[in-house]
Amino acid sequence: MASAGKPALDDSRRGTGSPKMKARENAKDTLCRNVTIYGRCRYEDKGCAFNHDPLKVNSAYQFDSKKRFNVDSPSFTPSLLPSNGSSPTISSATMKKMATISPKAANAAPFQPRSVASRSNTSTPNSRQENINPDWTVAEVQEFVPQGFDVAHMTALQGNGNGTITPTNAFDPFVTASTPLSAGGAVGPVQPNPYSHDSAALGGAAFFPGSSGFQQPVQYHMYAPIGPHNQNTLGYQRNVHDLFLPNDFREELQKKAAATLQTLPNTQLPAQIDYFHSLVPLDLNHQKNATVFGFPSWVYKAQSSKDGNFYALRRLEGFRLTNEKAIRSVQAWKRVCNGSVVTIHDAFTSRSFQDSSLIFVTDYYPLSKTLAEQHLGTGQRFQGRHNVHIPEQVLWGYMTQIANALKAIHSNGLAARIIDASKILLTGKNRIRLNACAIMDVVQYDSQRTVADLQRQDLVNFGQLIVTLGANSPTVMHNPTKAMEHFTRAYSPQMKNSVFWLLNGLQKDQDRNIDIFITGISSQLMSTFDSALHLDDQLTSDLSRELENGRLVRLMTKLNLVNERPEYEHDRQWSENGERYFLKIFRDYVFHQVDAQGDAVVDLGHVLSCLNKLDAGSDEKITLVSRDEQSCFIVSYKELKKALESSFQALLKPARRMH
């Protein structure tokens, strides 16, 4: 029986035909999907039955389109059009009318598809050519095409390529696109590219976005990395400096802030000098030294009672003012505003130190050093240690900054008169400022030397300072010949010639002023200026990381202002239900986490992560459980942010009505 029934089963299979075998037979006319996706098929020479030539498939597709559409057939004209959204009711008279062809339909021009007409040689009669409407094409939206994919497959989607759209045919971006190998050349709606600009407003202009569009507001929780980016790191690598302020810069600012706020209790200093209080001595050497000014001088940090700022007070001990015009000369120095000169704010006499003292008020730079302390070993803890040789580029930086200071001073008809390593402040990395400039104008007010002579003396003092720094010895100018020999061996000829020109500043052989000197070192000025620009870029980049760093504090402030307000317990409009109940449970989720043993979880990372997501309004959903564990809610951070903003605005409404 089994053998007898077997042939009948085979006959039935041969009669119906196997779909798998039919697909095998048509495999040679089907384009391999590997070619469409990857551009090539690795099994092409290993028995793959599909076609690997896109041109053959395209020609077969065009031939199939020509077979399916007959251009000589009459156009179809429906005799009854349904209304919008309603199905028509067809009567017997209407059915009879539809059974016959109207004379208008018999004389109509033959139907010709647009996609076929562009590829066939058949043309419509010339008498009907003028009445044809402009060709309708789909918006040429730039789409992703895999590598190796033949662009001929997209011809059915591009229409005739004239780039025009009939206004009555609005583009619908939500209609699913038809595949190139379906519908036999019919033009279907194309799914827009989500990465193209304003795809719904494209009028055939694929590469020109619309003029109007909604601009999203700035998201302050996102920090944009501002240049410069000089680190040789890969795209996935991150440094600590990419996330926070550089440690050395942060520590330096914190130390300066601590030094500014430092106080000295139980001190023998006066409690107040004029309008200054909280004096702290800044001198490292407690021995009296009257070498520079002719009077022992001391420096203090003090706070002003007028504006609350901190200033440096330089006191000349034992000075007696004999001429009131001498102290008025400080008024001219108040007009000197230069980045390389320490600004002078005031000068007055005082007897608060139980003597007659002259006080100069200048800007205070915390943790600053003098060039003598930095390079000449003055005040060092280990006296036997040799000083480090100053690189030439650093020395050029000092020269350009001092030249900048002298340019500003001489332009105001003044002279520095004090250019000494012990009176030049180093306030930052290779950043110096000329200090104690106005003191000699008060102390030696009766001097008979002219301003021009004093300005030339500034050039000589300038040259002696550079030689002293280059030799790393404060007493090197006692033997000028030996000092210049060492300087010539250590530095370039341009540096040597510049210093020689400064040392000969008092000679009358030629006109010597600071402008001529600046012209001679103009090439080094550009190098110093470039370094200043790089520092500005770096500081701007560091500052951008600290932008809006108080946003989490504002967020926590809003949460605490909204949650658990006892005065609104019986207010129906402010009862803790709905969105305010979510915020209350969310506060417990962020700050009141417990572990499996019931101990409090102090996780700063969890708190910052939740607050950042709340500030950003993330779509991430979290599960919130009530305190009695009887209610469970699944909400997103976006919903929580919206609830927080609405609750906070509702909290402000009574205050607005009062005002």
UniProtKB/Swiss-Prot annotation:
**Keyword Ribosomal protein on this protein?**
no
**Disulfide bonds, paired cysteine numbers:** none
Cell location: Cytoplasm
> Ranges of Polar residues compositional bias?
115-132
| Recorded coiled-coil stretches | 523-561
Which Pfam families does UniProt cross-reference here?
Answer: Pan3_PK (PF18101)
Q: Where does ATP bind?
A: 314, 363-370, 422-423
Question: Zinc finger (C3H1-type) residue ranges?
Answer: 26-55
Q: Where is this region: Knob domain?
A: 562-659
Per the record, the similarity remark reads:
Belongs to the protein kinase superfamily. PAN3 family.
User: Domain note for this entry?
Assistant: The N-terminal zinc finger binds to poly(A) RNA.
Q: What is this protein called?
A: PAN2-PAN3 deadenylation complex subunit PAN3
Task: Name the encoding gene, please.
Answer: pan3
